[in-house]
Amino acid sequence: MSVDEICENTKMGREYALLGNYETSLVYYQGVLQQIQKLLTSVHEPQRKHQWQTIRQELSQEYEHVKNITKTLNGFKSEPAAPEPAPNHRAAPFSHHQHAAKPAAAEPARDPDVWPPPTPVDHRPSPPYQRAARKDPPRRSEPSKPANRAPGNDRGGRGPSDRRGDARSGGGGRGGARGSDKDKNRGGKSDKDKKAPSGEEGDEKKFDPAGYDKDLVENLERDIVQRNPNVHWADIAGLTEAKRLLEEAVVLPLWMPDYFKGIRRPWKGVLMVGPPGTGKTMLAKAVATECGTTFFNVSSASLTSKYHGESEKLVRLLFEMARFYAPSTIFIDEIDSICSKRGTGSEHEASRRVKSELLIQMDGVSGPSAGEESSKMVMVLAATNFPWDIDEALRRRLEKRIYIPLPEIDGREQLLRINLKEVPLADDIDLKSIAEKMDGYSGADITNVCRDASMMAMRRRIQGLRPEEIRHIPKEELNQPSTPADFLLALQKVSKSVGKEDLVKYMAWMEEFGSV
């Protein structure tokens, strides 16, 4: 007995149940349960046998659930007279009307499997009911008196008076549901009109996904949008020059919109170039926080799809959402993976279309025009570790191209203080001397050193102990201060992640294409 076959049949049964094909789903569930029962006879390991018994029990519950759904649906089809046992307070004329209609219902010989459109399944013998209603027209007016309870038995006659009575009464039953649906439709409009102002008054506005798949919009809002990154300039160590350039290019145009007009218009985009781990993503989040914009954190996975034309639609949807939530900041991390140079031999037609759409959309977000508000500005930030692979057209649109270097000694010391603010330190520790030993380390490398050094005391305390003894160690004994020796040992374990040859390449590219 193949386990893969059991998994496949279980998957098919669940898929058919989700699609509403319950009969086929039951067949698959029955087959799976029989397969598991046969498999249990050949399993002799107690633990494995217990696992399969648990799986069989869970699948049996799913099978019973689908079976109950099928039974309920069959009840709707096979019992058209189910609403007859109505409450005792129903009016008598309806019961007479039904008795008069029942003999007529048996006259025509119809195929029970054929449903006469456009009426529901419960109204299969519709022609006899209509004839019965025409023979006895006074009966149709009688039920309109107890209109509050009448609509439940609309099989006796489906004339206009019933529907008008149902709409006025708002009673229960199927006929009443149709009448109440009309009221709901009319009331739904008023409800929307009432809700619209309250939505506008709320703290957040909702993007209207008209023309787009609702799932695409929800995925972008869930995975990309960050309305409050909560990262400030003080949370980033060093990079004083980069902060100043970003503030001038992104933040100041929102603070002084009257000044940044004409030739002083805001930049179309900013490209941050530098080795990995230098804080490019943190700078982008700080920009979004300082200027109070909606932050879109985009990667290549967010804008690619296996379906033809779907990736271009995602790019267009991203920029439309950014304009809707404006002022916005679109941060495209590792932009070289999306917009590498065009015309290369390894380029695919789909990726070329995505690049073209991205370039077109970036040309359309160059900032507010003369007739637009400054609050509608969309700023594009991009980061890359391989600036020499970026397409020339994209490089032109990213007008500011700044270099994010490795932290200097002051930045390294500040980063040590930020990372160790919640870690107890020994009195004889000197962070400046430790920072001097970290020359050539990136921000991510320094963070790894701090993490490793902060765990040294715990490692010494639990060395040679069994798990039961480790569980009973008091928290105070584990949280011992970190010593200079811990940092020296951590520096021996954590090496640099950026080589000198890479730094030379970055500096050469900035000398040729930099725009600071």
Curated annotation (Swiss-Prot):
The record's region (Disordered) falls at 75-212
Q: Per the UniProt record, which EC number(s) apply here?
A: 5.6.1.1
Under the heading PANTHER family, the entry gives: AAA DOMAIN-CONTAINING, KATANIN P60 ATPASE-CONTAINING SUBUNIT A1
Q: What is its main location?
A: cytoplasm
Q: Where is the composition biased (Basic and acidic residues)?
A: 133-143, 155-167, 179-212
- UniProt subcellular location: Cytoplasm; Cytoplasm, Cytoskeleton, Microtubule organizing center, Centrosome; Cytoplasm, Cytoskeleton, Spindle pole
Q: How is its activity regulated?
A: ATPase activity is stimulated by microtubules, which promote homooligomerization. ATP-dependent microtubule severing is stimulated by interaction with KATNB1.
Q: What keywords are annotated for this sequence in UniProt?
A: ATP-binding, Cell cycle, Cell division, Cytoplasm, Cytoskeleton, Isomerase, Microtubule, Mitosis, Nucleotide-binding
Similarity annotation: Belongs to the AAA ATPase family. Katanin p60 subunit A1 subfamily.
Gene3D superfamilies from the UniProt entry: 1.10.8.60, P-loop containing nucleotide triphosphate hydrolases, Phosphotransferase system, lactose/cellobiose-type IIA subunit
Catalytic activity, reaction form = n ATP + n H2O + a microtubule = n ADP + n phosphate + (n+1) alpha/beta tubulin heterodimers
Q: Which Pfam families would you find in this protein's record?
A: AAA, AAA_lid_3, KATNA1_MIT, Vps4_C
Identification of the protein by name: Katanin p60 ATPase-containing subunit A1
Q: How does it assemble?
A: Can homooligomerize into hexameric rings, which may be promoted by interaction with microtubules. Interacts with KATNB1, which may serve as a targeting subunit.
GO BP annotations of the record are: cell division; microtubule severing
Q: Where is the composition biased (Gly residues)?
A: 168-178
Q: What does this protein do?
A: Catalytic subunit of a complex which severs microtubules in an ATP-dependent manner. Microtubule severing may promote rapid reorganization of cellular microtubule arrays and the release of microtubules from the centrosome following nucleation. In mitotic spindles this could allow depolymerization of the microtubule end proximal to the centrosome, and subsequent poleward microtubule flux.
Cellular component GO terms held in the UniProt record: centrosome; cytoplasm; microtubule; microtubule cytoskeleton; midbody; mitotic spindle pole; spindle; spindle pole
Q: Which residues bind ATP?
A: G274, P275, P276, G277, T278, G279, K280, T281
A GO molecular-function descriptor: ATP hydrolysis activity
